[in-house]
Amino acid sequence: MELPLVVENRLHDLAEWLIAWTTPSEPTPEQWNACRIFAHRGLHDDPRVPENTMASLAAVLYFEDIHGVEFDIRWTKDLVPMVFHDPDLQRVFGNSERLADLTSTELRQRFPLIPTLSEVVRRLGERKHLMIEIKEEHYPEPEHQLEVLQETLAGLVPGEHFHFLLLDPVTYEKLSTFPKASILLVGGFN
């Protein structure tokens, strides 16, 4: 069930207030030192570089203090995992088509800035930690899609080189062959 935006915003404000009000104390220096910085969708807020493109993701390589990068994957019609946040191309590219309705070849010909998961893994895989958000969407061939993820991430160590982020607990079952410690369920409004 999707909440009206005004209700979602109020609930978000309430949650932030409760967290701020109930937080017992400032983190200790040890806790601060244990924190890791992740770039959200690469250089998410840089108007010169569209989010989740190879340029925005690879930019983290220039920053030693950035531990890793968070990005989302969506599946094309021919079941290739692409690095993209939205189900359609409207917000980033001004096109209302859905990624799931295009083959990877069509997508790459018309929107060459959108990388495949494989390209991102090859470029960043062992150099920066990957936080891969698996979106809640229709999975027409879940066994095949799981195999594709396994093959794409085969050279990396789950939990050391990457984690999966899930907003939907149902998706957790689709990743059954990956170690549980490499799968993080995230709560909240996103």
Spans of features found by a protein language model:
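Phosphate-group recognition and catalysis centered on beta-loop-alpha active-site segments
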Residues: 1-190
